[in-house]
Amino acid sequence: MTAHLKKAELHCHIEGATPPELAVRQARKYGVDTGTIIRDGAYVWEDFTSFVKCYDAVASLFRTEGDYALLAEAYLTELAEAGTIYSEIIVSPDHGNTVGLGADAYLEGLAAGMEAAKARKGIESRMLITGIRHLGPEAVVRTAEYAASHRHPLVTGFNLAGEERMHSVAEFSRAFDIVRDAGLGLTIHAGELSGAFSVRDALDHVRPARISHGVRAIEDTDLVRRLADEGVVLEVCPGSNIALKVFPDFPSHPLRRLYDAGVRVTLNSDDPPFFHTSLAQEYEIAAHAMGFSDGEIDRMTRTALEAAFVDEPTRERLLAALHI
C-alpha cells in the first residue's frame, strides 16, 4: 500500500479531472443531454480522437467562475485527502473563451477553488496554461501572449497539449520563446502518440525543463541517455498510457526502464476519471504492477517537487514537508 506516502502531481488537465457524477450534475444545471458521453457512470470514448471530443463536451459543462471554482476545489480536495501536498493543473483559457466566460474569469474561478482547497486542506497548487496543438501555431501564439501578459500569481508555467500528430514542434517555437521570455516554466506534450523523434524535436526546438509524457523516448537509447544527462523531467502517466493503448499493459510500460537508466521521472494521472485512475492509484500501480519500492516512489515525488514551477521558498517548504 502507498497510502502512507506523500504525493505530488505535475500533470493533470483540470477539465479531465471531472468525475462523471459531477459532469451529470453540471449537465442537469444547463439542460444538456449526456447520453452520448456518459454511459453506466463512465465516460464513453474509443480512441484519442473520440476522447478529445468527449473531453471537450465535458469542458463545455463548466460555464461560470463558480463552476470552475467547484471543479478545482473538488479535485484538489480529493488529492489532499490522498496525501498530496502539491499539484499543478493544466488549464486552457480557450475553454473559457469557448463557453463565453472569458479567459480572465476562467482563471479567477480556478484560482478561487485552488485557494479554497489550500485553506481547507493545506494543499499547494499552481496552474500551467496550455496551448492546443490542433488549433494551430497562430492560436498557440495568441495563448502564449496571453499567458505572458496575464501574470496571475498562480500561473507559473506553459504547456502544449492536444493532437500530437498535427504540426511539427518547430512551428510552435515562437510561442515558447514568448513564454520563456516572460519567465514561465516550460513543458510540452511529446513522446505519447508520436515516437521518440517528437521528444528529440521538443528538446531541440523548445528546450523545456520537463516533457509531458515522453515515454516513447524508450525507443531510442541515445535519447534516453540524453534525457538522463540533461536532467529533463518526464511527467509520466502510466494509467493514461495503457488506456490510450500507447503500451498494451503495465509490464510493458517503460517507467521502470527509464528510472533505471537515470531519467528523472514522476507519477501523474493526466485525465483520471476518463482513464479509470487517480493519482493515488498511479502510486499503487508503481508499487504493485511495476515493483517500485517506497524509497523509489519517494524519490519520484521528490523529483516532482524539485521540478515544480514554484518559487524557491515554496519549493523548500514542500521538500521539508515530504517526510513530516
UniProtKB/Swiss-Prot annotation:
Binds 1 zinc ion per subunit. Transmembrane segments: none annotated. Belongs to the metallo-dependent hydrolases superfamily. Adenosine and AMP deaminases family. Adenine deaminase type 2 subfamily. It comes from Sinorhizobium medicae (strain WSM419). SUPFAM superfamilies: Metallo-dependent hydrolases (SSF51556). It is an enzyme of class 3 (hydrolase). Catalyzes the hydrolytic deamination of adenine to hypoxanthine. Plays an important role in the purine salvage pathway and in nitrogen catabolism. Its EC number is 3.5.4.2. Zn(2+) binds at residues 11, 13, 189, 270. One of its GO terms (molecular function) is adenine deaminase activity. Pfam families: A_deaminase. The record marks 213 as: Important for catalytic activity. It comes from the Bacteria. The active site is at residue 192. Its cofactor is Zn(2+). The lineage of its organism: Bacteria, Pseudomonadati, Pseudomonadota, Alphaproteobacteria, Hyphomicrobiales. It catalyses: adenine + H2O + H(+) = hypoxanthine + NH4(+). This is Adenine deaminase. PANTHER family: ADENINE DEAMINASE.
